[in-house]
Amino acid sequence: RAAENGDKPFLSATRDGEGRAISWNEAARQVAALAESLTRIGLEPGDRVMLVSENRPEWLIADLGIMAAGCVTVPTYTTNTTRDHTHILGNSGAKAVIVSTQKLARNLIPAVLFSSECNHVIGIEDIRTGQAPETINFHHWDEMVAGQADVGALDQRRGQRG
């Protein structure tokens, strides 16, 4: 459908009081770039990716990108506690999580630390991690949807590996 609708608006959101639209073409590009990035960080078809986000355009792009990589989306509630996240990570065997905000990451990161399978955290917004262990790789959404050819810099400081 992206080819049919091109630059027509597909998704929209209000950020900082301003409306912002994402075209069909841009959404398709981000989906493909995310799928490529998930594969690049080591995910394989059939791997699970937990998605912790409120309704926003990135949620749909994440879901489609996960599926385009051949992986399985594990959607969760934004009201989950650390205990809930720990249970879902253990039960699903998710190898990565995508989380939208620092607020949601507060209950998620301790569960990721406890998980034996999950070692990738992708933050849609900036996620402050403090003293993150070497076993967890943190990635920023903007880098994941930029596509390999679009990356101008990779931030390799502690807690921002990706």
Locate predicted features.
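Short acidic/polar active-site loop segments enriched in Thr and Asp
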Residues: E44, K95, N119
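Conserved AMP-binding/adenylate-forming core of the ANL superfamily
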Residues: F10-L64, T81-T86, N137-E143
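Structured binding elements
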Residues: G70
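Conserved residues at the C-terminal ends of beta-strands
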Residues: S12-T14, K95, S100, I124-E125
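ANL superfamily adenylate-forming
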Residues: D16, A105-G162
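AMP-dependent adenylate-forming
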Residues: R1-S23, D126-P133
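Conserved ATP-dependent adenylate/AMP-binding module captured primarily in the ANL superfamily
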Residues: T78-L113, D142-E143, G147-Q148
